[in-house]
Structure formats: C-alpha cells, structure tokens
C-alpha cells in the first residue's frame, strides 16, 4: 500500500513537471499598440480588441515615454494604428523613432494600419520611418472618402488568409488610407498581399481611378524583422478583425492560427458601400436623433448606421445602453454585439446587471454572451 502511494506521488510530480514545461515552451506573443498623440482613440481600441481574438497573444498599449523607458524590450511586435502618421511621428520624437526601427530590425514585428502604414512609408516631404519601400501619392486628396471597400488577394495573400482564398472579392472598412506605389529612393522591396479594387473619390475633389488597382496590403523584411502595412481597417470591420493578429503572426514568422467560426465571418459584408456626401449628411443628423429623437427614430438610425458601418456611430452607441427606452437599450446591445465591439463589453455587462425589466435583461444577456463568445 505504501509503495502504491509512493508511485502515485511520483506520477503526480511527473505530470505537474510536464505540464509546467509545456506551459514554459508555449511562448506568449507579446503585442504592443502605440497610444500616442496622432492615434485615433477608436483605432487604438480596435487594434487592441483584434489582438484579443488570438489566444496565444497578450496585448498592451504603450506611449512615447514608455519607448524611452525600454518597453520594447518586453514586446515581440508592435502595431501603429490609424490616426495621423506624421503626428504620430512627432509624438514619438526622433530618438524614439530610432529605437522603434532598431527594435524591428533586430528581428521583431511591426504592423501599420492606415496612418501607421503612412508612418512606415518612404514618402517624400513627409515625416515617416521609410521602412516599407512604398511611397504615398496624391496626398493632397487624402480626405478622398471612406466606406466598405473591396479588395482581392494575390497568391501570397491567399496563403496568409486561406479563409478568403476562394473569394474573388472581400470587403473591409477603408478610411482615407494611403495610395501606395514603389519608392524610387528605397532599396526595400515589398510584396503585395492584396489589391484595392474600389475607386474612392467621394470627397475632397479626389480624382477617379487613383485608389483602384493599388496595393491594399503590403509586407517586407527590414533587417532581421518584418513589416506589414494595411491601407484599410480590418480591425474595424465585423467578421474581419482576425486579419490583424494574422498579420502580426506573419511579421514574426509564426504559423497561422485558425480562429473560431464566429470570429471569421467574411460574409458580413458582401458588397461595396462608399459613403456619399448625402450619406455623410444623414449620418451627422443622427447625432441629433440620439439626443432628441423618439425611441422609434433612434432604432431606425441604428439600423441605418449599422448597415453602412458608420465610423462615428461606434462613439454614440455606448450611452444608448442606458437610454430610457427598453427597446433602444436592446437595439444598442445588438449593435455592439453584431459589430464585435469588445471595447464595450464592460458597459454591456453593467447594463445587463443594472437592468430591471426582465425581458430586456434577458435580451441584453444574450448579446453579452454573443460578444464574449468571440474571445478564445
């Protein structure tokens, strides 16, 4: 009996040792999202929530002061989100720009989204890193418009995003991203992973046939590291946010990871929808609706805004979880859940717990569970 007990103890110790060793060998991918002046707050939120979809990754934000303090020593990859590229450059400061470039060249990864892609470019007369081999053209018409844009994958893109490989076109949110061509002044050569198929010229007197047939995703090596640049916003597109952690994996030379079916939903948008000037006017009017409109008007506004993936609505919907109309509260929860907005999960849970009407509480609870189900 004593020997049996000893054997059991030995087996337990061996199991614990093996489990600990496995956990140590399974390296966590440490990702940082730059949170500096010039980065749009919602773009920062969305980059963070996209990384949360990958169970092997941890994510934090970091500031320009954090760079100087050595935060890059504790990161494997960084993301520079949307906003204003040159403003982000100014906020970092030249010494920190040098530190970031050295970090990437040492064998680490970097993903630039929209303004981040601008920042990584080699654009003349523009404050940028000059690390992706591309230059932005037609900057004078940068405010050319936004909306759900279409793109096609190249052969390299199909390898990285096999979930989209059989689709002739896929769709994500575009918001005034750079129009790239190869830089004559750079020795860096990039690979195109996707091509922009939408011709965006709705605003700012932008010329036609400028954005279409231009790179949508590009990637390259930089020293021992890798850089991925996206001109558009998968992280802000329901069902497509998973593309961001996939890009991070590419920058680190890591194998792709399959994400859950409720995370990979490319059929949420199956057609182009570029916001017209009339749409923008309508969108702006709904701010007043949410302040002064009836419950029916608010619900109709949320319907319209969700279909068009309104850029502004994601800032307005948070407070509607606490509207005085139960129907509006439910519709706001539905909007947040169906747009994958994990940033508002704590608000959703608070609204659920504070709700007094049982039918409304049950409905909000369903949407809370739908949102939580996105997480690994």
Question: What residues fall within each predicted segment?
Answer:
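Aromatic-Pro/Gly-enriched surface loop or interdomain linker
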Residues: 22-74
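A glycine-rich, often tryptophan-bearing local segment used as a flexible ligand/cofactor-contacting loop or short
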Residues: 86-165
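Short inter-helical turns and helix N-cap capping residues of alpha-solenoid HEAT/ARM repeat scaffolds
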Residues: 293-294, 324-325, 356-357
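Amphipathic alpha-helical scaffolding segments comprising HEAT/armadillo-like alpha-solenoid repeats
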Residues: 279-289, 310-322, 341-353, 375-376
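Catalytic beta-strand/loop cores that center a nucleophilic Ser/Cys/Thr
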Residues: 149-223, 231-235
């Amino acid at each position: 009996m004593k020997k049996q007990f000893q054997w059991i103890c030995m087996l337990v110790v061996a199991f614990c040792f093996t489990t600990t060793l496995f956990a140590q060998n399974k390296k966590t991918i440490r990702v940082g999202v730059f949170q500096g002046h010039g980065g749009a707050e919602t773009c920062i939120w969305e980059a963070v929530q996209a990384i949360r979809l990958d169970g092997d990754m941890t994510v934090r934000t970091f500031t320009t002061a954090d760079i100087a303090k050595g935060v890059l020593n504790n990161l494997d990859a960084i993301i520079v989100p949307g906003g204003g590229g040159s403003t982000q450059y100014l906020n970092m400061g030249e010494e920190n720009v040098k530190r970031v470039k050295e970090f990437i060249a040492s064998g680490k990864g970097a993903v630039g989204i929209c303004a981040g892609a601008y920042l990584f470019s080699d654009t003349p007369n523009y404050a940028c890193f000059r690390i992706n081999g591309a230059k932005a053209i037609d900057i004078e018409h940068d405010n050319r418009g936004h909306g759900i844009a279409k793109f096609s994958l190249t052969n390299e893109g199909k390898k990285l995003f096999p979930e989209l490989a059989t689709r002739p076109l896929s769709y994500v949110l575009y918001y005034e991203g750079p129009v790239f061509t190869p830089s004559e002044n750079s020795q860096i050569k990039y690979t195109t992973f996707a091509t922009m198929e939408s011709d965006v010229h709705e605003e700012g007197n932008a010329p036609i046939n400028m954005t279409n047939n231009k790179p949508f995703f590009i990637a390259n090596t930089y020293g021992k590291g890798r850089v991925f640049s996206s001109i558009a916003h998968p992280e802000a597109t329901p069902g497509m946010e998973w593309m961001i952690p996939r890009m991070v994996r590419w920058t680190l030379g890591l194998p792709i990871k399959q994400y859950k079916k409720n995370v990979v939903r490319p059929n949420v948008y199956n057609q182009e929808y570029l916001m017209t000037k009339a749409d923008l006017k309508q969108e702006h009017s709904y701010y007043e609706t949410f302040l002064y409109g009836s419950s029916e008007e608010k619900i109709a506004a949320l319907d319209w805004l969700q279909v068009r993936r309104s850029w502004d609505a994601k800032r307005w919907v948070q407070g509607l979880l606490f509207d005085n109309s139960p129907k509006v509260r439910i519709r706001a929860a539905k909007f947040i859940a169906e747009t994958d907005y994990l940033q508002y999960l704590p608000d959703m849970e608070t609204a659920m717990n504070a709700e007094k009407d049982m039918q409304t509480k049950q409905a909000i609870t369903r949407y809370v569970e739908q949102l939580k189900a996105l997480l690994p």
